[in-house]
């Protein structure tokens, strides 16, 4: 039987300075978004997070090991099975003891955004809240953000259930989950602020943010004035720095398309004629008509019995006709929505909001499908291609392409009019066909720099390229589509030197697929280097290209017949 070790090194949370006691540091007011000087900024519009000295007296920022704090509850992040090993969790389970493990086994697995509470064992804190931070995925951004928001809220509510008066949070958004530090910090602070604004949060005397790295400490020092301003200067800084979406009353991100949509009653409804009587509202008129018919019948009893029946029938038909014409029908809106102020005259009903909860908004899914259906197949393909190009462009800016750069397959020079020329050596890629994906990114990076100088030309050397080492048709198709999308308007001509029969065939097939326009219409084949020799004289062309030129065109000397009148 193992015994739980005794914890030493307890820190009294009451000795930690609260946010309102922390010295104001103007250096923390760093605004990188709009570069607006704080003193020149004027507050316009509603203030999202006002100066609240009572809340500021309950929030604390502290750097250290959360396990040392003697708050009633400590909160940390773990995996769904609560078996993740790191500095904090290892220490918690070391001193938590068998009682904590029993509580975990009773609760079982914990899902993303949820929390469970257990005994603190021999830790200074009485309780430990185990929560599960979601794995960050930009594709499911709102789900990840709201799950992290739920981690903080569920921890607060579980602590309230056990009558905690103090609580400390570690940094729940962890690097293991790829959660951005800045985004996670925004969610944490706005969720805590929204909770402390609620009346039932008064039971918490202290809420401590226990930070364990200097990077996070610096980040929280810059973010706290945004959500917990202490003076007018920080309030102005908050107005500048707040993101557009500050969430709802709980700090949870608002997803417009997920709001409840209930259709409002239609203004008209088609009914069968025999069903109209169910909408009659002129009850007094109905009674009068019936009385008139009865009176007429009683008078007619004194008349000739032979004429009695016919007269009664005429009177009833006449009254029914007048009755039908005089009836006023209630609209279906009033019948199904009788409390709407549009149809009511009572003072109480007049105060009802016209935009009631039954107001319908267009289903965003239907709206998107409607817009999508209006687009042609070509428009849809262009949008997909633009999205793919934006992804490639972003990757070309951030990825490490040093391996491709060392191949030296691109050179740059200028023509006699000082227009840029991009020279591509295909044989330099012969042995690295596995890098074609990075080659595409590198070409995008080079061309993005080139178009800053205006129109340009390309000279591509296909010398010494074997059929096995040539790029496949799908890669070439993607390259041509990107050129057509972004660089066609800048491209003056596309010169291919030493083309093979296979390359010409491949490009011919590409013309049949993509059409003989754009980049493909600007291709110029050169069987030798006579017409481009003047242009490439400034480049350090590999000797293998000259060797190929000599052997293919049976040249036995190093002189070329230059055509000085030819320019690209």
UniProtKB/Swiss-Prot annotation:
Coiled coil: none annotated. Belongs to the GDAP2 family. Gene3D superfamilies: CRAL-TRIO lipid binding domain, Leucine Aminopeptidase, subunit E, domain 1. It comes from the Eukaryota. Residues 46-228 form the Macro domain. InterPro entries: CRAL-TRIO_dom (IPR001251), CRAL-TRIO_dom_sf (IPR036865), Macro_dom (IPR002589), Macro_dom-like (IPR043472), Macro_GDAP2 (IPR035793). The gene is gdap2. It comes from Dictyostelium discoideum. PANTHER family: GANGLIOSIDE INDUCED DIFFERENTIATION ASSOCIATED PROTEIN 2-RELATED, GANGLIOSIDE-INDUCED DIFFERENTIATION-ASSOCIATED PROTEIN 2. Pfam families: CRAL_TRIO_2 (PF13716), Macro (PF01661). SUPFAM superfamilies: CRAL/TRIO domain (SSF52087), Macro domain-like (SSF52949). Residues 281-313 are annotated as: Disordered. CDD domains: Macro_GDAP2-like (cd02905), SEC14 (cd00170). Residues 397-553 form the CRAL-TRIO domain. This is Protein GDAP2 homolog.
């Amino acid at each position: 039987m193992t015994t739980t070790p005794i914890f030493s090194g307890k820190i009294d949370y009451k000795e930690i300075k609260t946010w309102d006691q922390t010295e104001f540091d103007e250096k923390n007011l760093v605004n990188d978004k709009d570069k607006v000087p704080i003193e020149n900024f004027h507050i316009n519009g509603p203030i999202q997070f006002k100066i609240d000295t009572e809340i500021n007296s309950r929030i604390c920022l502290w750097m250290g090991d959360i396990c040392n704090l003697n708050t009633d509850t400590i909160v940390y992040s773990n995996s769904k099975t609560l078996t993740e090993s790191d500095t904090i969790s290892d220490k918690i389970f070391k001193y938590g003891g068998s009682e904590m493990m029993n509580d975990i086994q009773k609760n079982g697995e914990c899902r993303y955004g949820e929390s469970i509470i257990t005994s603190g064992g021999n830790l200074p804190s009485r309780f430990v809240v185990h929560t599960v931070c979601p794995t960050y995925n930009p594709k499911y951004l709102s789900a990840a953000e709201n799950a992290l928001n739920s981690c903080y809220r569920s921890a607060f509510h579980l602590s309230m259930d056990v009558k905690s008066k103090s609580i400390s949070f570690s940094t729940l958004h962890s690097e293991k989950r790829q959660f951005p530090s800045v985004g996670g910090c925004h969610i944490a602070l706005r969720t805590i602020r929204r909770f402390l604004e609620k009346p039932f949060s008064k039971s918490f005397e202290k809420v401590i943010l226990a930070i364990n790295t200097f990077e996070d400490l610096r980040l929280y020092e810059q973010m706290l004035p945004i959500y917990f301003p202490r003076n007018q200067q920080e309030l102005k800084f908050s107005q500048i720095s707040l993101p557009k979406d500050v969430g709802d009353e709980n700090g949870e991100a608002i997803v417009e398309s997920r709001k409840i949509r209930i259709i409002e009653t239609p203004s008209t409804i088609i009914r069968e004629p025999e069903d109209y009587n169910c909408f009659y509202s002129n009850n007094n008129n109905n009674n009068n008509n019936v009385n008139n018919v009865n009176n007429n019948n009683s008078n007619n009893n004194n008349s000739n019995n032979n004429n009695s029946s016919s007269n009664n029938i005429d009177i009833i038909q006449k009254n029914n006709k007048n009755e039908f014409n005089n009836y006023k029908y209630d609209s279906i809106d009033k019948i199904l929505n009788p409390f709407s102020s549009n149809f009511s005259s009572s003072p109480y009903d007049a105060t009802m909001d016209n935009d009631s909860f039954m107001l319908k908004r267009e289903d965003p899914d239907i709206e998107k499908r409607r817009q999508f259906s209006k687009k042609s197949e070509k428009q849809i393909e262009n949008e997909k291609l633009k999205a793919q190009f934006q992804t490639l462009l972003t990757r070309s800016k951030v990825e490490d392409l040093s391996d491709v750069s060392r191949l030296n397959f691109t050179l740059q020079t200028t023509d006699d009019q000082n227009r840029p020329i991009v020279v591509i050596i295909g044989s330099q890629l012969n042995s690295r066909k596995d890098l074609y994906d990075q080659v595409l990114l590198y070409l995008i990076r080079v061309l993005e720099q080139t178009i800053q100088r205006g129109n340009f030309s390309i000279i591509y050397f296909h010398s010494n390229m074997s059929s096995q080492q040539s790029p496949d048709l799908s890669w070439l198709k993607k390259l041509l589509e990107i050129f057509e999308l972004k660089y066609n308007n800048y491209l003056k001509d596309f010169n291919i030197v030493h083309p093979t029969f296979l390359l010409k065939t491949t490009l011919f097939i590409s013309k049949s697929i993509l059409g003989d326009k754009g980049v493909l219409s600007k291709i110029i084949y050169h069987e030798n280097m006579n017409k481009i020799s003047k242009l490439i004289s400034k480049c350090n062309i590999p000797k293998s290209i000259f060797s190929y030129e000599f052997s293919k065109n049976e040249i036995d000397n190093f002189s070329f017949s230059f055509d000085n009148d030819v320019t690209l």
